[in-house]
Amino acid sequence: MVAFLSMYQIMVSAQCYTADQQQSWLQKAEAAKPTIKKTIHHPLQEVSIVKDVEAFQGYKAVKVGDIKDLYIQSFKQKKEVVVDFGEHLVGRVSFKIKDIGGMQDAVLRFKVTFGEVPSDLALPVEPYTGGLSRGWLQDFICDVSYDGSFQFSRRITARYMKIEAIGTSAYSDFCFDNITFESTTSAGLSKVKLADSTPMIFKDIARVSENTLRDCMQGVYEDGPKRDQRLWMGDLYLEALANTASFQQYDVTKRCLYLLAGLANPRNGLLYSNMVEYPTPHAQNSFFVDYALSYVLTLDDYLKATGDVATGLDLWPVVKNQIETVLSQAIDQNGLYSNTSYQYPGMMFSTVFFDWSPVALDNHAAIQGLLVYTMEHALDIAKRIGTTAEVKDYPAQVKRLRAAGKKAYWDAKQKLVLSGKEKQNSYTGTSWAILGGIISGKDAQSAIKNVMRNPKAIKPGTPYANHFLVQAMLNCGLKQEAKDYVEQYWGGMVRLGADTFWEYYVPDNHLFSSYNGYTLLNSYCHAWSCTPIYFIVNYPEVFQK
């Protein structure tokens, strides 16, 4: 089935990258480590979390009392409080208490819970059914000794903080003296200046986009500062696009590109899907084909923004390895990526992701389009760094892959992209068929309009997939449709009170979670939702009028 496999096996019998080469990449990543900026915040108001069927996930925060009372009135009598910092923050939290009756004569015990959104403090924690570590939840038992101070040992991501006194002395009394949230980010000042004519909803969407990216920009581009606190390659591409449009902190992008290269599989040259920065940078041993290809897109965006040819040349072998491994191992004699379950030798686990979906998503059309799209970006990189001779066969291969994809997945009669043996119609398959040029012009416009009319079509499950749908709309000239979609989807989160954009937003099911339905594991500041700022800045004729 697979062309050139034996040739590839011979090629990778030796190391793709030397130990010295990868060590050099890791050193360059360390040299590009950004400065972390810190800002001190204090609670702005005391709130109560109340039920509201119209609110996101059925709960909202309502101002009660005066925040000043927290620092003068007995907390032993009050017993419980929820404070609001006024915005979504990432960083270190500490608090102090002071005696207002007899001196403290016993350790004080508190239960403290942090929430990104009001429902984080209202939904039941137990029984825990989430598919990931319960340690991601931000609920703590805190013992305050005689010095009256406490600092959380781990980084916190939250807007709201609930404090409950669960162990106090009968012989002393106390109030809070100080509650401090020291926020962190590697983002600087935004370079965005929107036209005065920009509709308010898009100004708000741009602001929330920047907030999302700001809080995800730490030592690397994290996917979510609450959970998972790691660099995923798919998120990296979208964060890099948003950064180029806003903060322009290119050292973060450069660091991430070098970290991933330095941690790649040295024998086959493939990039692992994600890496964790602490305690020392290390990769998780999984291979997402679409994410590995997105590395090429990220490097191309970085080169366009910075003109850093030296980095482009340095990482060029990584670019070629991702593309040529896929071409040599996974493309059949008909020019199709025909087995999306293919397991790449040397990788513990291989998959094609594209989106979380409640219904199994067929990714054949999507991966075909992405491969073509990636090869075109690789050609752009080659032109910038002077390596076009190494990819002189790419244009012919692109033509072949496009033709194969159109023959296999384009139903010219119905004007639909139909993926795989089951002929599945999905927004994601349609988006990537357009982005990869498998269909274009009027056909592309018809494909988007028809998939959106099809009640059986598989809709996007995440902001990640929705980004590429909007890009496909813009690429084929459906500018008003793109504008409306951003306003409805990301604007929907804004209207529900989002400070930062969420990991999931399913308009007709606010409690959706891919973690066995356990909503408290969801992230409410997630990198793959930060890209409206990219659209708003780069398409002013669409979004700033």
Regions found by a protein language model. Give the residues of each.
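Bacterial Sec-dependent N-terminal signal peptides
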Residues: 1-16
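Residues embedded in well-ordered secondary-structure elements
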Residues: 3, 84, 150-152, 228, ...
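Second-shell loop/turn segments in exported
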Residues: 191-198, 226-229, 241-244, 361
